[in-house]
Amino acid sequence: MSRISIEQVKHVAHLARLAITDEEAEMFTKQLDAIITFAEQLNELDTENVPPTSHVLDMKNVMREDVPTPGLPLEEVLKNAPDHQDGQFRVPAILE
């Protein structure tokens, strides 16, 4: 028995503003049913002694100390700029 109906697929497609044909709705129904069946297999797993986790991997942020360093020289920064004036990038005006 299918766990999702063609009407449900058409309804979700309508909510998503997707125009699908009857053939596409039938194809998506079969695909979604297979996905749901596969996902339901997870209910068969014994998770009794498995602690809840928020991440599968034990991840930690490894931070380094901020060390101030000199920036690039102004000439180096502006050398690839298409246009500059008074040590600043010059860009076309966007407001009138």
Swiss-Prot record:
* Coiled coil start-end: none
Which source organism? Geobacillus sp. (strain WCH70)
Does this UniProt record's set of keywords contain Ligase?
Answer: yes
EC main group: ligase
What NCBIfam families would the database entry show?
A: gatC
What Enzyme Commission number(s) apply to this enzyme?
A: 6.3.5.-
Record key words, sorted: ATP-binding, Ligase, Nucleotide-binding, Protein biosynthesis
Q: Which GO terms describe its molecular function?
A: asparaginyl-tRNA synthase (glutamine-hydrolyzing) activity; ATP binding; glutaminyl-tRNA synthase (glutamine-hydrolyzing) activity
UniProt lists the family membership as follows: Belongs to the GatC family.
Q: State whether it acts alone or in a complex, and with which partners, per the record.
A: Heterotrimer of A, B and C subunits.
Q: Do you know which Gene3D superfamilies this protein is assigned to?
A: Glu-tRNAGln amidotransferase C subunit, N-terminal domain
Q: What is this protein called?
A: Aspartyl/glutamyl-tRNA(Asn/Gln) amidotransferase subunit C
GO terms under biological process: glutaminyl-tRNAGln biosynthesis via transamidation; regulation of translational fidelity; translation
Biological function: Allows the formation of correctly charged Asn-tRNA(Asn) or Gln-tRNA(Gln) through the transamidation of misacylated Asp-tRNA(Asn) or Glu-tRNA(Gln) in organisms which lack either or both of asparaginyl-tRNA or glutaminyl-tRNA synthetases. The reaction takes place in the presence of glutamine and ATP through an activated phospho-Asp-tRNA(Asn) or phospho-Glu-tRNA(Gln).
What reaction(s) does this enzyme catalyze? L-glutamyl-tRNA(Gln) + L-glutamine + ATP + H2O = L-glutaminyl-tRNA(Gln) + L-glutamate + ADP + phosphate + H(+); L-aspartyl-tRNA(Asn) + L-glutamine + ATP + H2O = L-asparaginyl-tRNA(Asn) + L-glutamate + ADP + phosphate + 2 H(+)
